[in-house]
Amino acid sequence: MSTLSRNALPLEGQVAVVTGGAHGIGLGIVERLLGLGARVTASDIDESGLSLLCERLAAKHADAIAVHAADLSEEQGAQGLHRAAVERFGSVQILVNCAGGGVIRPFLEHTPETLKATIDRNLWTALWCSRVFLPDMLARQYGRIINIGADSVRNGLPDHAAYNAAKGGMHGLTTGLAREFARQGVTVNTVAPCAVNTEVWVRIKNANPELAQRFLDVIPMGRVGEIEEVASMVGYLAQPEAAFVTGQVISVNGGSTML
């Protein structure tokens, strides 16, 4: 990548795609990358959420933000996102796989449908999107793939077996891709948050305070993370200066797991 001028933003001239970008952590990441100078296509299965995102960001970032609604657990959905992003802004250098969400319940209370949905939302979305965006990165010998994993894979939170199976697969995808493409200018990392102060967290806290407290009890700092704290780590990993960081699962977790 070319050397930045003194006043240039670190991601100026770069193009990013953020999946799961309409809400919560994904929305925070969209805002962070825009603030760093990237042009961003946000994707989500929630069309109305994407419309609200555009309304929120249009005044400041009208020429730098695009949205595309798709089911990214299907190959065709990921291919459609790739076409839309490239047509709008050109070749993509940064992919943030943030699409996800799972059904959190005791393992034997899952149905075949909830198990499949949890794997589809978290793992298949990352697999398909990585597969369709990697060739462009390899052609330029430069790219950043950042997966949003889960600290629960490491600390074994209650009722997270299915969710951890999906996110653990994402962690494995991270190390496999990082090694495979390490000499081709593409870094692949995972940011693994603990519970984060999103709308989902608020719903859990209100609906099941006892379960929410169990999540809090494993965090030495005694609080959940903030969206901006996760987005900040993603913003660093997306930059050229993070060129020597690859294959890592980096926890943003208030100490809920260490080392």
Curated annotation (Swiss-Prot):
InterPro entries registered for this protein in UniProt: NAD(P)-bd_dom_sf, Sc_DH/Rdtase_CS, SDR_fam
Residue numbers binding NAD(+): 18-42
Active site as annotated: Y163 (proton acceptor)
Keyword Plastid: no
Catalytic reaction annotation: (2R,3S)-2,3-dihydroxy-2,3-dihydro-p-cumate + NAD(+) = 2,3-dihydroxy-p-cumate + NADH + H(+)
GO BP, one annotated term: catabolic process
A single MF term (Gene Ontology): 2,3-dihydroxy-2,3-dihydro-p-cumate dehydrogenase activity
Top-level taxon: Bacteria
Its EC number(s): 1.3.1.58
Keywords, comma-separated and alphabetical: Aromatic hydrocarbons catabolism, NAD, Oxidoreductase
Pathway(s) annotated for this protein in UniProt: Aromatic compound metabolism; p-cumate degradation; acetaldehyde and pyruvate from p-cumate: step 2/7
Family listed: Belongs to the short-chain dehydrogenases/reductases (SDR) family.
The protein's name in its UniProt record: 2,3-dihydroxy-2,3-dihydro-p-cumate dehydrogenase
Lineage of origin: Bacteria, Pseudomonadati, Pseudomonadota, Gammaproteobacteria, Pseudomonadales
